[in-house]
């Protein structure tokens, strides 16, 4: 199981997270391109069997990001990075969770966010067969 936790800066994950993707999820290690024609190919994932969870924290409220900006942070991450590296699967969307207005929410709301993460991790631990 792979977990990513990152804040969003300027509608992207942090530069350190982006650099990690650039330097680790490289062609030849994470995926390769399969040619269809001379000018077109598609990615074949080498990490298809890996399980992934992502938690993204936003300073912004949900409404403008999900509507005006068409949820571009999550869409870019899942479609632009994860589908290359982990192959296409619906769980890449459902297991990428976003927490909104993090610097401005109450402690109670922040605790609720943390409980979501804890619940997911406990669920993952219980699925591990020893």
How would you label these PLM feature ranges?
Residues 64-130:
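Glycine-rich phosphate/pyrophosphate-binding loop and the adjoining helix
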